Regions:
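Flexible, active-site-adjacent loop/turn segments at secondary-structure boundaries
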Residues: 2, 145, 253-254
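Sec-dependent N-terminal signal peptides of Gram-positive bacterial secreted proteins and lipoproteins
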Residues: 3-23
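Bacterial lipoprotein signal-peptidase II cleavage site
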Residues: 18-37
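Short, glycine-/small- and polar/acidic-enriched structural segments
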Residues: 35-41, 45-190, 203-213, 229-230
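Pocket-lining segment of extracytoplasmic ligand-binding domains
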Residues: 113-114, 122, 196-280
């Protein structure tokens, strides 16, 4: 993977953000659009007269890209949300894409590279409204301290999730930038979900894996022989001139054009949900 790829990805995301008019701020844990950017567009009074009374159908992946969404449901139960939400969680991005394309979802929290691909394939029909996740990927080593740099991964087997999505592209890019051929110099075993990776690590001596938070912390609590060997955000910053964006929230353009007030109200709720997640 060339450095140009990362630049094009960032450009595609920037274009989609600009096209939808929803610039956003974010944090490494999980972040969404700043409430300051949208609060004036969706006050509580406006939320009572939204252009649709249907629940906003939104999907997310199990993991960091959806952490900022989880408090929407409790907000809805408490009467603090601007609308009703139908939030569905999936184990893999390829489960979400067809639902989004067929109009069975209104929004989704997905890997950044997938968002860029969908933006291009749909000619802007799928657009980003918020960056929800920055750098949350780590190399974790079990029972040793042999991995001190990307170069130390040469010749090793690496367990990972996210084949065809951000984790794969980030890992391959970083390996290549450090002189390691990801197809010849390492063996990468992909699993559908992070929980499958942690289960495999438990049964493998000297295992090495790429995991996102919060799974890194959860795995460490279950096995005290695990250690964080590398922060892939730090490794990215050493070789790339773009920020590492791993997840974004997207909306169907048709839905955004028909219900701009709903999108604005969602972003306000989203910001509150993220704030609660970061506080918890």
């Amino acid at each position: 993977m060339k450095k140009l790829t990362s630049v094009l990805l960032a450009l595609a995301l920037a274009l989609s953000l600009a096209a939808c008019g929803g610039a956003a701020s974010s944090s490494t844990a999980s972040s969404a659009a700043s409430g300051e950017a949208v609060s004036e567009a969706a006050s509580s009074e406006e939320a009572k007269e939204l252009s649709t009374t249907d629940a906003l159908r939104i999907a997310g992946l199990k993991g960091p890209t959806t952490m900022g969404l989880v408090n929407l449901l409790s907000m809805e139960e408490d009467g603090a949300a601007s609308m009703d939400y139908d939030l569905q969680l999936y184990g893999a991005a390829d489960e979400i894409v067809p639902l989004l394309m067929k109009g069975e979802l209104d929004m989704a929290a997905i890997p950044a590279n997938l968002a860029a691909t969908l933006y291009q394939k749909t000619e802007g029909g799928i657009q980003a409204v918020a960056v929800n996740t920055l750098g949350v990927l780590y190399v974790v080593e079990k029972g040793g301290d042999t991995v001190q740099s990307m170069a130390d991964l040469a010749g090793r087997t690496i367990l990972s999730t996210g084949k065809g999505t951000t984790p794969e592209y980030v890992l391959r890019y970083l390996l290549a930038q450090n002189g390691i051929d990801p197809d010849k110099d390492v063996t990468i075993e992909y699993y559908s979900e992070a929980t499958e990776v942690t289960a495999q690590m438990a049964n493998t001596e000297d295992a090495i894996a790429v995991l996102p938070q919060p799974y890194v912390t959860a795995a460490g609590l279950q096995d005290d022989t695990l250690r964080v060997a590398l922060d892939l955000t730090e490794e990215w910053n050493k070789v790339a001139d773009t920020q590492l964006i791993t997840g974004v929230t997207v909306v169907r353009k048709e839905y955004a054009e028909e219900h701009p007030d709903v999108v604005a109200a969602f972003l306000t709720d989203y910001a509150k949900s993220v704030e609660a997640a970061n506080t918890d």
